[in-house]
Amino acid sequence: MTRYKAIISYDGTLFSGFQRQSQARTVQEEIEKTLQKLTGGQGIQIHGAGRTDAGVHAYGQVIHFDLEQKRDPEKLRFALDTQTPDDIDVISLEIAADDFHARYHKHFKTYEFLVDIGRPKNPMMRHYATHYPYPLDIAKMQAAIKDLVGTHDFTGFTAAGTSVKNKVRTITAATLTQDPKTGFLVFTFSGNGFLYKQVRNMVGTLLKIGNGRLPIEQIRLVLESKNRQLAGPTAAGNGLYLKEIIYEE
């Protein structure tokens, strides 16, 4: 068996998420169906570094899979890229070490979240940025976002009912900028792992701080109390992008 590692991007608008689900269109299912065609009917399972939700996009998702026959990586990449649906792009593909695992090999992820603060909103970007038409103090949010950096228990920022027991994660960078061309707000978070809906809950809280409905100290309060009820609402998934995954050597 030969293990392959690929970097893929996708428009999440018409997907019910990355992970295979019954009676729902997913990124995993589409790639596995294409691999099955390319291998003459073999059942191939792919493994992703992250399980993005419905409507969430990716610039740099990483997957791995095993094939019985060794294939030329570029020819395989081209075949996958041209035979998967148009909302999936196979950026690169290479032979990986036998013990490489896209999800469990130690890595750092970067997520980006776009917020359209225009009044009126940009209808062409409705699937690619979350609209927030209310007044915002950007400087306030830029000050508050710094409290997320470091190693914390992020229980207060994860969705209820998550099965993950250890909710301690490290965020190495958290920034908020404004795109000079579009005027969109760009939230960027990098870290060693993120809990279910963590990024969307952090953005929802920051927007509420910027709107003056939560104090600037609320991020610290949520982290210290581990109370989801003190955080803001979950921001919509359409503004979220899995931007990059970097593996340790």
Swiss-Prot record:
Stored Pfam families: PseudoU_synth_1 (PF01416)
Subunit structure: Homodimer.
EC number: 5.4.99.12
Gene symbol of the encoding locus: truA
Presence of keyword Isomerase: yes
UniProt catalytic activity: uridine(38/39/40) in tRNA = pseudouridine(38/39/40) in tRNA
Xref: HAMAP family: TruA (MF_00171)
Active site: 53
UniProt protein name: tRNA pseudouridine synthase A
Binding residue positions for substrate: 111
